[in-house]
């Protein structure tokens, strides 16, 4: 019986020791703000693993917002941290230079103490994680009527003399407006290669007849 009690006490002591060790190595986070760079200390990772990072000295805004942030958070418990930061940044900008001066003096004093305590300190900002690029292409927006007219006039610069050619041109505009923008350039290039020799030798009426008989193909 005594052996069981001793085993339980030993297990409880180990758990308590682990909790205390976790509390000592837990991360400390300084809240970010819109006008200055805050220093953030996390548990060791990468090159800082196993090393104690030195806190960056506070600037004037951090000294001022240290108490203001707590005050705003108590008055507005539902407000998110990002909204509090925006409000504090706006209030800081509205202060006059005379109102800001005591906080600048306090920041200079803290920086002097920091230099004496950590003479070899160098600020090393953390690199921001790059957003992952998606392989999926966004659908292209449909071109305007003016762009479609320019494309038609560029690839088919013939004169419309009869109703047949005008109908062919109208049919081409309808297909350009209803087709997907990605397939427009490919179809026009195929037609340009197919009718390049015909447009130089034949008459506009002959070209219009070919166009109406063989409409462009638009893959779905």
UniProtKB/Swiss-Prot annotation:
Provide the taxonomic classification: Eukaryota, Metazoa, Chordata, Craniata, Vertebrata
Q: Quaternary structure per UniProt? A: Interacts with CALM, EP300, HDAC3, KPNB1, ZNF208 isoform KRAB-O, PARP1, SLC9A3R2 and WT1. The interaction with EP300 modulates its DNA-binding activity. The interaction with KPNB1 is sensitive to dissociation by Ran in the GTP-bound form. Interaction with PARP1 impaired its DNA-binding activity.
The ranges of region (Disordered) come to: 193-220
Q: Which UniProt keywords apply?
A: Activator, Calmodulin-binding, Cytoplasm, Differentiation, DNA-binding, Nucleus, Sexual differentiation, Transcription, Transcription regulation
Q: Which Pfam families match?
A: HMG_box (PF00505)
Q: Name one GO molecular function term.
A: DNA-binding transcription activator activity, RNA polymerase II-specific
Family from the record: Belongs to the SRY family.
What is the protein's major site of localization? nucleus
What GO biological process terms are annotated to this protein in UniProt? cell differentiation; male sex determination; sex differentiation
Q: What does this protein do?
A: Transcriptional regulator that controls a genetic switch in male development. It is necessary and sufficient for initiating male sex determination by directing the development of supporting cell precursors (pre-Sertoli cells) as Sertoli rather than granulosa cells. Involved in different aspects of gene regulation including promoter activation or repression. Binds to the DNA consensus sequence 5'-[AT]AACAA[AT]-3'. SRY HMG box recognizes DNA by partial intercalation in the minor groove and promotes DNA bending. Also involved in pre-mRNA splicing.
**DNA-binding region at which residues?**
54-122
Q: What is the name of this protein?
A: Sex-determining region Y protein
Q: Which CDD domains match?
A: HMG-box_SoxA_SRY
Q: Which domain of life is it from?
A: Eukaryota
**Native source species:** Arctocephalus australis (South American fur seal)
Q: Where in the cell is it found?
A: Nucleus speckle; Cytoplasm; Nucleus
Q: Under the cellular component aspect of Gene Ontology, which terms does the record hold? A: cytoplasm; nuclear speck; nucleus
